[in-house]
């Protein structure tokens, strides 16, 4: 159980668990490889003949690997996790305050969606705009976390990204219904 034993002490930091640097802009193929290596080590079939304690540790490690992988794979969850590691709670449930310009843009998008819900080219153009905004926000988050180490600012941007992501899903559903 070499990987399990080696990584058990790193279970308090998902980045260390996978042998990655703690940063927002991560090497996703390296994350995939590390995850698969750990999963091969801790797969229940490999420990079926082990002691109860070995089986339990393997199961705990498999669960931890899944949770850590899902967290780091998703940019929003990864950003929130990094903020949390640095003592910043994004307060997603209670803090919905956003800058006025951001709220205006959200209202503009929502009005466009309502007014053009049957106009596929207009909806696709709106989706391109939303995706561009998402990409710009991801760049800002990367700068806030990896560059400035400003986790409070990153948390604010992540709250905005959640709004953008939610709207993008709604817009995508509307487009899918037309196709």
Which residues does each predicted region cover?
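C-terminal accessory/regulatory regions appended to core domains
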Residues: 1-179
């Amino acid at each position: 159980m070499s990987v399990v034993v080696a990584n058990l002490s790193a279970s308090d930091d998902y980045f260390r668990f996978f042998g990655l640097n703690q940063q927002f802009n991560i090497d996703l193929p390296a994350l995939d490889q590390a995850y698969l290596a750990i999963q091969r080590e801790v797969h229940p079939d490999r420990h079926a003949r082990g002691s109860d304690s070995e089986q339990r540790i393997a199961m705990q490690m498999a669960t931890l690997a899944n949770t850590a992988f899902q967290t780091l794979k998703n940019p929003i969850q990864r950003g929130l996790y990094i903020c949390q590691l640095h003592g910043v709670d994004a307060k997603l449930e209670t803090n919905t305050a956003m800058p006025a310009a951001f709220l205006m843009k959200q209202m503009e998008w929502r009005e466009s969606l309502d007014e053009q819900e049957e106009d596929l080219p207009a909806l696709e153009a709106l989706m391109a705009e939303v995706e561009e905004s998402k990409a710009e926000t991801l760049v800002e988050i990367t700068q806030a976390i990896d560059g400035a180490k400003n986790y409070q600012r990153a948390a604010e941007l992540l709250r905005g990204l959640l709004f953008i992501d939610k709207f993008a899903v709604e817009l995508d559903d509307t487009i899918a219904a037309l196709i």
